[in-house]
Amino acid sequence: MTLLCGVDPGSRTNAVATLDMSGKRPCLLSWCTLTREELATFVSGMSGFLAIEMVEGVAFDSVRAADLIQTQRAAGGAECVAHVNGVRYECLSGRDWRGEWLRFPTASDKAIRVAIEVTVDFDADLPRIYHDDRKHIYDAIGVAIAGLVVVELILAFAAWRMPSNEEFVAAHPVATQGSA
C-alpha cells in the first residue's frame, strides 16, 4: 500500500486527507480536521509521503493578517515536524498544485471538486464530507495528488539525466578499473 497524505492548513483547523495510491486510481482512505498540535502529532507518526499546501500571502486580504499568520504557523509546523522525523514531504502553493494537477493555476473550487470526484475513489466506509469541510478536504486531496506528481517528475528527470553504467565507465576509465 502506497500512502499519500495531503494537508490544507488553516488558521484554526487543518484538513488532512490520506490516500492509497497502489491501485489504478487514488482511493481516499480517511479524512479529518485537526488542530495545529494534533497535526504535529499526526505528522510525527506517519509513514508514506506528505504534501503540504503553503500559504500565498496575495490570496489573503490584509484584514485577515492574523488568520494568515496562524495558517502559516500550521503549514510551517507540519513541514518542520516532517523534516525532523524523516517524513518525505513536498510543499506546494495553491497555484502550484492546481497548476500542476489541473494545468490551470487559478482553477475554481468547483473545478477541483469535479476533478477529485472523477479521479478519486472514496472508501465506502468513510463518513460523509459535509459542506463546511468539503473545500478544505478536497484541497488536501488535491495537494496530495499534485505533490506526488511533482516528486515523480523530479525522479523521472533524475533517472533520465543519470548516465548508464556503460557511459559512466567510458567517461571515467581510471575510477572504474579493478585493482591488479
Spans of features found by a protein language model:
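Phosphate- and other anionic-substrate recognition elements at nucleic-acid/protein interfaces
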Residues: 1-180
